[in-house]
């Protein structure tokens, strides 16, 4: 099976960016941050940009989708979660948030994952771990306060994001523990390992908002696809190949490594 991987298209700022199906792909995986309605969004329509990938509207292969973080910008979290799922159902796109799907003897296990903000804390001495998490919280909240995401009537900040991440992690651990006689592919938006960290920034407190340290889960999959960081990844760690193919922002010079028709085989 050949999987075309796309993420971090940010169609809200580049709505005219055209993406074409890879001619040899059997499946398209969208690993989040496809389009949003953040302040100043230029995205037309109400389908988060997903309509252009609809198998019911001409996309030639099945499509799996895990939402990113930006889909929730400037909106209420739970209402938008339901709206995204309904949008996928209407467009014939397979929703993969905390879902497992088997296609041609390949198991796809997906979740946005979010961040527990402990990726760097795990490297610290026990007495310093909480301080490291608090630094990561502060770095994240500086940005999260600008997104406008709310949940239960309150701004959705780092502590609440961590709670959601722990829910996703628990689900993922349980899903991967289910025996499967075949190939397992994990799809997340947030990265599973600091090995995916953006080399432009290194391991700073903000990195814990992009990468988790779930390296112990890597041996449970043959392939792990993710997004979120605007730099490509393609490495093998603990027997698992980890791949990201984000578009990113043209204005930040992040698109040079993007490969529109990139496919990974399993």
Where are these regions (language model features)?
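Beta-strand-turn-beta hairpins that frame and shape the catalytic cleft
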Residues: 1-4, 100-110, 236-241
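Glycine/small-residue-rich loop that forms an oxyanion/phosphate-binding "nest" at active or ligand-binding sites
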Residues: 75-96
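Active-site environment of divalent metal-dependent phosphoester hydrolases
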Residues: 10-16, 36-39, 70-80, 100-103, ...
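N-terminal active-site segment of His-dependent metallophosphoesterases
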Residues: 1-65, 72-79, 151, 158
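Short amphipathic alpha-helices and their capping/turn segments at secondary-structure boundaries
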Residues: 17-22, 53-57, 95-105, 125-132, ...
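Active-site neighborhood of phospho(di)ester-bond hydrolases with catalytic His/Asp-centered motifs
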Residues: 5-7, 28-33, 63-69, 94-98, ...
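Binuclear metal-dependent phosphoesterase catalytic core
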Residues: 102, 198, 204-222, 229-266
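Active-site-proximal loop/helix segment associated with metal-binding centers of metalloenzymes
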Residues: 109-185, 192-195, 200-201
């Amino acid at each position: 099976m050949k999987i075309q991987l796309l993420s971090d298209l940010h169609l809200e700022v580049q709505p005219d960016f055209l993406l074409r199906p890879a001619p040899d792909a059997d499946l398209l995986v969208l690993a989040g941050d496809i389009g949003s309605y953040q302040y100043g969004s230029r995205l037309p329509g109400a389908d988060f940009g997903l309509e252009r990938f609809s198998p019911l509207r001409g996309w030639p292969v099945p499509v799996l989708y895990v939402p990113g973080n930006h889909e929730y910008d400037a909106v209420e979290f739970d209402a938008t979660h339901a709206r995204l799922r309904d949008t996928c159902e209407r467009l014939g796109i397979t929703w993969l948030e905390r879902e497992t799907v088997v296609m041609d003897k390949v198991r796809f296990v997906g979740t946005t994952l979010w961040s527990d903000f402990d990726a760097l804390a795990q490297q610290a001495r026990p007495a310093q771990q909480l301080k490291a998490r608090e630094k990561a919280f502060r770095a994240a909240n500086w940005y999260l306060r600008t997104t406008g995401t709310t949940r239960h009537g309150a701004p959705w900040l780092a502590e609440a994001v961590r709670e959601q991440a722990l829910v996703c992690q628990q689900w993922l651990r349980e899903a991967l523990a289910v025996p499967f006689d075949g190939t397992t592919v994990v799809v997340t938006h947030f990265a599973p390992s600091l090995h995916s960290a953006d080399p432009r920034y290194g391991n700073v407190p903000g990195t814990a908002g992009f990468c988790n340290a779930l390296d112990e889960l890597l041996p449970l999959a043959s392939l792990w696809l993710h997004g979120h960081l605007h730099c490509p990844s393609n490495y093998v760690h603990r027997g698992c190949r980890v791949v990201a193919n984000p578009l990113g922002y043209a204005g930040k010079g992040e698109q040079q490594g993007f490969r529109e028709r990139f496919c990974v085989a399993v």
